[in-house]
Amino acid sequence: MKEYNIVITGVGGQGILTAANLLGWAALRAGYKVRVGEVHGMSQRFGSVIAYVRFGEDVYGAMVPEGKADVILSFEPVEALRYINYLKKGGLVFTNARPIPPVQVSMGLATYPTLDEMKKIVEEDFGGKFMAFDAEKLAMEAGNIVTTNVVLIGALSQTPGFPLSEEQIKEVIRISVPPKTIDVNMRAFELGVKAAKEMLGL
């Protein structure tokens, strides 16, 4: 595999950089060349955050070029649209369905698009696929809303053609999280896997 590109986005405080590091470490342990990058200075709570994970046999530079992302993994729906130019034709947007309205929306200066409107933009304007589910609800079902990022990683692992196995990712989660949180993180991962399989018809 020459390269696989993931763009992870959302707002500060959602665990985006942790997710990027977990995926990068899993790819490294799987034997790939890995580059992980992030936009610095933007991770204050509720500020827009973007991280890049690139891995494969032929990967140079941490930044994913526009139009080259295989997947956009978004922790907040409208943030997926903010960075939609990164998605390649035929790529997949996996997003948490629960919104955190931007300041402009809260002030009444803009309207927040519906999930159906977002799906139309991704599929008709960018030739991608759009899938949204309430990852926060599943994280709470697992036992802790903080595991929303792990729910989304579980969903990502089911993406058609995704190069990393479930076990490769779970092993990194097990050795990365505090020991007392391993069980809740494993539950979160499995709930994300289940949700993705249902959406993808697997």
From Swiss-Prot:
EC number: 1.2.7.8
Reactions it catalyzes: indole-3-pyruvate + 2 oxidized [2Fe-2S]-[ferredoxin] + CoA = (indol-3-yl)acetyl-CoA + 2 reduced [2Fe-2S]-[ferredoxin] + CO2 + H(+)
Annotated InterPro entries: Indolepyruvate_Fd_OxRdtase_bsu, IorB_Oxidoreductase, Pyrv/ketoisovalerate_OxRed_cat, Pyrv_flavodox_OxRed_cen
Source organism superkingdom: Archaea
Gene Ontology terms, MF aspect: indolepyruvate ferredoxin oxidoreductase activity
Coiled-coil annotated residue ranges, if any: none
Thermal response of activity: Optimum temperature is 70 degrees Celsius.
Pfam families: POR
Record keywords: Oxidoreductase
Subunit: Heterodimer of the IorA and IorB subunits.
Function field: Catalyzes the ferredoxin-dependent oxidative decarboxylation of arylpyruvates.
Database matches in PANTHER family: INDOLEPYRUVATE OXIDOREDUCTASE SUBUNIT IORB
UniProt name for this protein: Indolepyruvate oxidoreductase subunit IorB
UniProt organism field: Thermococcus kodakarensis (strain ATCC BAA-918 / JCM 12380 / KOD1) (Pyrococcus kodakaraensis (strain KOD1))
Gene that this sequence comes from: iorB
